[in-house]
Amino acid sequence: MKYGHFSSDGLEFIISHPVTPTPWINYLTNDKYCAIISQCAGGYSFYRDCRTDRILRWAPDYKNFDRPGRYIYAREQRAGNKKSKVWSLTYQPLRVEPDAYECRHGLGYTTIAQKYNGVSSRIIYFVPVDDDCELWLVSLTNETNKEKKLELYPYVEWLVGDYHEELRYRNIMNLYNRMWFDESHKLIFGWKTAFWQGMNIKEFKNFSFFASSLDVKGYATRKTEFLGRYNTEERPEAILEGKFRNTALCSGEDGIACLKHVVKLAPKQTKEFVVVLGETEGQSNAIKLVEKYRDLAQAKKALEATRDLWKKRIAGNIVVKTPDSDFDTMVNTWVKYQVYICNLWSRSPSFYHEGSGGRGYRDSAQDSEAIVSINHELTRKRILQIAALIRREGTSAPGWSDTSGPNQHRPNKDHQVWLTATVRSYIQETGDKAILDAYVPYLKDKWVGGWDIDLQHKGGTTTDGEGTLFEHLEKNLNFCFNDVGERGLPKIGHADWNDAIDAAGKKHKGESVWLAQALVRSLKYFVELCELVGDKAKAEEFVRKAKTMTDRINEVGWDGEWYKRGFTDDGIAYGTKDYEGGKIFLNTQAWALLSGVAEGEKFDKILKSTAKYLDGKHGMALFYPAFSHFRPELGRISMFSEGTKENAAVFCHAAHFMVVGLCMAGRGTWAYESICKLMPNKQKNYDLYKAEPYVYAEYLVGPENPYRYGEGQFTWITGTSGWAFMAATEWILGVRRDFAGLRIDPCLPSAWKKCSVRRPFRGDVYDVEIENPNGVEKGVKEIYVDGTRIEGTLVKPLLDGKEHKVRVVMG
């Protein structure tokens, strides 16, 4: 693989050259502090929320430069008239070509090592498990036979505060800056006097800090003075020209933190030190953290704890073994890690997006369903947080922030169809049906009917009494069922799953076929919950509702060879053969399978149409053909360049919907081929693909783009990861939770003769060996549990805390 490879155990991706096609990044995080770091230490950090509590400066357009970041400049003063040697220990920002370089992105840490000028350096970046900071554990070795005297300059650029307000009003926000060197404790503080979101102004009580375990010989806090006029991090005047002025205060201008250290290295000698960067409430807490981690032993202990935690989280649960080692590497390690990152930070912080902060309702619902098999406690926590966003009328806020509460934007209409599936999966995984009786508050805010604003509402968000989780779900689904247009399909409103279909319902009349299908799936799941609690009458009510919506879909949503996508405010059907552009959409074909709406000849026709119009060498396109000009009745979906984003890209999230659908249809080889086309470690040309080989992209540029077909975009924070994990483990390998136990029903490529899944479930561990002697794609002939044959495909939990052998014979 060009540019790098996985370690032998698959737990690290090793990058062999600093100049990758795009920055290849990692997320280092605990539950509150997060650092995003590239292979050259570019990136930023935040505390609790990447918008409102950004620590370091960064913006998406910086991706092309991979700056600024977490740097250590090195300078060797040479004898006589020889010019000083200056370089950076992470290649960036000086870009001095090293003699040797390696970056290892691991689970919870990143290591950057290089050799230059006879000095080997290694920096391990990580975030401790329980503290609100990041540590840079630095090692320097003099590889020569002469003593070396080095000046070292750890460096970051502050943002400190609300990222969006900084982008909009940087000239004003900078005036709030106060950065200073604390002489008593030898550290630099970064602070803003006020927290400002719009006109909401309050005192900013958090203090960012930067320190080192080495003796401080100098310091800098003012960016312009440090860099010099018209310079960037690539030419810092203070270092290159020896103009380090020890300015202790930065007031009302761009601030940095840079410390100066002097290190003498005898021949072959190694020295270690640690840099501490973080944010706390109050200066005293920062000082305590700095003093703690100036002790190298404490820093190393924290590193081991971080490594142990992530290894336990990732390796200590589901493990698969198949004939495809690339498949195994992704499923066993990297997609799990990506699912964790998405669960912790949703769709907010990245190198690609603006970083709007908070967590999304529908995103978190899907992410927490995906993680339930490896961390059901986190799923339970998220379920109750999401449910608290539901209003009494059944609508919901689109998300929430740990710093500013529920999101007050107009929500997309699909929020109502995701949480029921998550609750169902949680109960199937744990048996904890008591969660349905948990009391959760209802949200009260300015929105009425999910569309209109109550002009009489004063203030922000409050609660409006409470109800059980079961009642919240019922209200959620009933609102979606009743909020329909003239054809009886749910209104699309501002948008459904596809954010970019944002004009089809701006008059609040447009309808969504896809949303109707997703609703049918959720209605059926709610029937199961009703049966679980013994409410027969309500179960029958929701069976009728599911049938009613199914009949409507098949009456007005079928186009002859596939399902339409929806109807605009003016009644124009799109996702139909008569529409110009966007004639067939992937989502409505996939969800016709997922919801059970498609039956008989419709079932076969949508598979044929999907293969004919949507599938390609890089995966299934979101729709076909792409829009070539603006369609005002649909919105910005038609404004993107052909093949990018929602305009007919290979949208990986949606493509995995279809992978699950194909497994439901028994098409194992097609499902496997489809999932492989999207796996980042299976791409053939990384100069084309560009994105990281170890995490999923949001999309690949689609086939109608003139020259970028197959390029990966918007990695890490995408619903793709959760659906990829579920598709692989629960549908292709076919080991999935059920209320009464583990359902084992694989859908394999015909070439696979055997595979296995190690699956913890309700306190037991089930080692499932799957045999496929005749190369079938679907069908279970026999199942044996600890040598005893059982009837059917359901393995009932033994609940004895032991390991059990399960032999599955397909046929």
PLM features: what roles do these ranges have?
Residues 368-488, 512-516, 520, 649-671, ...:
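Aromatic-rich carbohydrate-recognition surfaces in CAZymes
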Residues 143, 147, 283-284, 429-438, ...:
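Inter-helical turn/loop segments and adjacent helix faces that build the functional surface
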Residues 1-364, 377, 382-389, 425-430, ...:
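Anionic coordination/interaction segments
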Residues 784-788:
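Short strand-turn-strand beta-turns centered on an Asx-Gly dipeptide
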Residues 737-768:
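Surface beta-strand/loop "capping" patches
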Residues 351-358, 397-416, 443-464, 490-511, ...:
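Carbohydrate-binding/catalytic loop surfaces
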Residues 155, 170, 397-398, 518-635, ...:
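Catalytic cores of carbohydrate-active enzymes
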Residues 317-320, 324-327, 338-345, 350, ...:
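Aromatic-lined, polymer-binding surfaces characteristic
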